[in-house]
Amino acid sequence: MAGMNTENENRVEALEVRLAFQDELLDALNATVARQQKEIDLLQQQIRLLYQQFRNAQPDDAPGGSLRDDIPPHY
């Protein structure tokens, strides 16, 4: 019987160690996801700003028309 208790204690200890490592890993992964979300938010903001700057620099009613309407010289 004593051998059975020691075996169970060893198994419980091993599970507790695994749980501690998994908790640490989960915290690290959560920090990574939070950092990446901040980077994504910043990149989206920069893309919106660049898009607005592009739209302001290339109005469709500008003299010469839109670049989308130009035909390449080889046609």
From Swiss-Prot:
Highest taxon in the source lineage: Bacteria
Gene: slyX
InterPro entries associated with the record: SlyX
Similarity comment text for this entry: Belongs to the SlyX family.
Taxonomic source organism: Chromobacterium violaceum (strain ATCC 12472 / DSM 30191 / JCM 1249 / CCUG 213 / NBRC 12614 / NCIMB 9131 / NCTC 9757 / MK)
Protein name: Protein SlyX homolog
HAMAP family linked to this entry: SlyX
